[in-house]
């Protein structure tokens, strides 16, 4: 009887792999129930799907087994097996970036399993296979004007959930959240900010981080149209939408609007619109743009931005620049009104504050 219990414990490799996948699928690292999705509305994350696919493929190719049949001895892997696996993936036509991702998935699995399988796992073997060189290919950028055109096109021409698709695009460009995070936003995640009269949206974004941003009361009232359209008291704001359906909708919209198919305009392109907007309307404050994008560093933020190099405001130019103030004294009231009607928000707010404090 004791031997049988020991055998069940020692040979539960599949259960331990499932534990790893569940760990990757957890919505919140903090375990805060305010931000956890109920099981009835949770989707299996793309992250988990990717890890699961990588793991199944590896053991099928290298060990010739399904993950449900694995025993501890199958966890032993040599550097030649890893090298041969990389070669196998290359011959299958996978790009280097995808191969690197798969190898990272495996190393993370083995790191998770090491504690319970010390006699079978040697993590150093993963260091014998070098990461393959990759060329970073960014998606194409878009603008607020173009994104709004796409949103309106979806509203007019899409047969299924046209209003929801339109508001999804508008939500994406305003919040700069990732698609997966937006699809998990619940009505209770949008709370009134009494100090401004606008609304705070809180989501679980990349890395299980709780992040927040604001939306205007005007746009929130637009979102409420979804409640009026659906009487089912749904918890999710964008109930029924999926990344796949949105990708297909965007593809159709690009075709209708004459956007070249070779242009890499994807759902993730919408994230950069809000980042660009904040940068331009904050007096080119890169840190404010970084906060809008919820990035750890400004280098990541700059990848999303469509700004061009402008040396006119560089220190090397402006330190020695003398500004002629005579046009300021010669300007008419109409000149000032015209200027401030087209000024960025930071400049306009500074001027209004100056006038009010006089």
UniProtKB/Swiss-Prot annotation:
Q: Where, by residue number, is the active site?
A: 178, 206, 268, 295, 304 (o-(3'-phospho-dna)-tyrosine intermediate)
What's a Gene Ontology MF term here? DNA binding
What GO biological process terms does the UniProt entry carry, in alphabetical order?
Answer: cell division; chromosome segregation; DNA recombination; establishment of integrated proviral latency; symbiont entry into host cell; viral genome integration into host DNA
The record's section on PROSITE patterns has:
CB, TYR_RECOMBINASE
Q: Name one Pfam family in it.
A: Phage_integrase
Q: Which residues form the Tyr recombinase domain?
A: 137-319
Answer whether the UniProt record assigns the keyword Cell cycle to this protein.
yes
Give the phenotype of cells or organisms lacking this gene.
Answer: Little effect on the percentage of cells with partition defects and no change in sporulation frequency. However, yopP disruption strongly increases the extent of the partitioning defects seen in codV mutant strains (by about two-fold) and, to a lesser extent, those seen in ripX and dif mutant strains.
Q: Which cysteines are joined by disulfide bonds?
A: none
Q: What are the protein's UniProt keywords?
A: Cell cycle, Cell division, Chromosome partition, DNA integration, DNA recombination, DNA-binding, Viral genome integration, Virus entry into host cell
Q: Where is the Core-binding (CB) domain?
A: 23-114
Instruction: Quote the InterPro entries the UniProt record gives.
Output: CB, DNA_brk_join_enz, Integrase-like_cat_sf, Integrase_catalytic, Integrase_recombinase_N, Integrase_SAM-like_N, Tyrosine_recombinase_XerCD
* Function as written in the Swiss-Prot or TrEMBL entry: Probable recombinase that does not seem to have a role in chromosome dimer resolution per se but rather may have some facilitative role during chromosome partitioning in general.
For this protein, the record's PANTHER family field holds: PHAGE INTEGRASE-RELATED, PROPHAGE INTEGRASE INTD-RELATED
Family statement: Belongs to the 'phage' integrase family.
Supply the name of the protein.
Answer: SPbeta prophage-derived probable integrase/recombinase YopP
- Please report the organism this UniProt entry assigns to the protein: Bacillus subtilis (strain 168)
């Amino acid at each position: 009887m004791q031997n049988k219990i020991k055998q069940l414990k020692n040979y539960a490799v599949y259960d331990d792999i499932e534990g790893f996948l569940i760990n990757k699928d957890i919505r919140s690292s903090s375990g805060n129930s305010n931000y956890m999705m109920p099981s009835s509305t949770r989707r299996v994350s793309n992250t988990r799907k990717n890890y699961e696919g990588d793991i199944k493929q590896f053991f099928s190719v290298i060990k010739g087994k399904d993950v449900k049949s694995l025993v501890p001895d199958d966890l032993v892997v040599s550097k030649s097996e890893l090298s041969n696996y990389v070669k196998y993936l290359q011959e299958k036509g996978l790009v280097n970036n995808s191969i690197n991702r798969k190898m990272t998935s495996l190393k993370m699995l083995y790191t998770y399993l090491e504690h319970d399988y010390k006699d079978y796992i040697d993590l150093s073997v993963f260091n014998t296979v070098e990461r393959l060189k990759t060329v970073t290919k960014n998606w194409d950028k878009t603008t607020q004007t173009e994104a709004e055109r796409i949103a309106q096109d979806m509203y007019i021409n899409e047969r299924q959930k046209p209003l929801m698709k339109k508001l999804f695009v508008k939500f994406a460009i305003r919040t700069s959240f990732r698609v997966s995070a937006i699809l998990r936003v619940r009505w209770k995640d949008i709370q009134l900010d009494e100090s401004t009269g606008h609304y705070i949206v809180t989501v679980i974004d990349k890395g299980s981080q709780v992040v927040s941003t604001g939306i205007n009361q005007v746009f929130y009232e637009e979102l409420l149209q979804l409640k009026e359209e659906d009487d089912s008291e749904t918890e999710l704001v964008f109930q029924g939408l999926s990344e796949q359906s949105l990708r297909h909708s965007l593809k159709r919209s690009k075709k209708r609007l004459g956007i070249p198919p070779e242009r890499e305009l994807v759902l993730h392109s919408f994230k950069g619109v809000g980042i660009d907007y904040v940068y331009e309307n904050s007096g080119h404050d890169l840190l404010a743009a970084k906060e809008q994008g919820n990035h750890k560093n400004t280098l990541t933020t700059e990848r999303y931005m469509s700004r061009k190099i402008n040396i006119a405001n560089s220190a090397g130019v402006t330190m020695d620049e003398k500004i002629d103030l005579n046009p300021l004294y010669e300007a008419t009231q109409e000149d000032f009104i015209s200027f401030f009607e087209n000024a960025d928000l930071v400049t306009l707010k500074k001027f209004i504050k100056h006038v009010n404090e006089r």
